[in-house]
Amino acid sequence: MKLLFDFFPIVLFFIVYKFFGIYTATAVAMVASLTQVAFYRLKFQHYEKMHLFSLAIIMVLGGATLFFQNPWFIKWKPTGIYWLSALVFYGSGYIGSKPLIQKMMETNINLTTKIWYRLNLAWTLFFIVMGALNLYVAYHYDTDVWVNFKLFGGVGFTLLFVLIQAFYLTKHTDEKSFEKQ
């Protein structure tokens, strides 16, 4: 259910774009992101950092898209999120005691420090590639193709990456790791 909630703004953006165009879809995505953050705060009594991060980016780039009537700002949003995520993941390997991926997953899985750092680097590289791929699609194809890629390509590649990662992790864990769940 949380996964569907996380994709709420992008799914609304996609649907509204198909009927009303990029500017209305951008405005709806901005409102949906704000609603998402407020709802999460009311329901769980705290903010989800990723929601706040995404909200800040969509408000700035979505606002610029609407103000300048230029869709290129919103087309840069996924790349901004991907590349800032890459920077955070990469930096976490040097700042603090553990890489970010370990902080996120260590209660569910037991890995060596070396594997945690490899996994963190893999996510860093994934985010860099996804940001570049978003720009490639945005600059080489029309907006219709980019909107489809934003939803289906972004989600599809992420699920594929998680699946590949799961296979990789099975080689580096034992059954006791999964008993914690």
Swiss-Prot record:
Signal peptide annotation: none
Pfam family, one: IspA
Family: Belongs to the YciB family.
InterPro entries: YciB (IPR006008)
Bilayer topology annotation: Multi-pass membrane protein
GO CC terms in record: plasma membrane
Keywords associated with the record: Cell inner membrane, Cell membrane, Membrane, Transmembrane, Transmembrane helix
Compartments, record wording: Cell inner membrane
Summary of the function given for this chain in its UniProt record: Plays a role in cell envelope biogenesis, maintenance of cell envelope integrity and membrane homeostasis.
Protein name listed in UniProt: Inner membrane-spanning protein YciB
Species lineage: Bacteria, Pseudomonadati, Pseudomonadota, Gammaproteobacteria, Legionellales
Main location: membrane
Domain of life: Bacteria
Transmembrane segments: 3-23, 54-74, 81-101, 119-139, 149-169
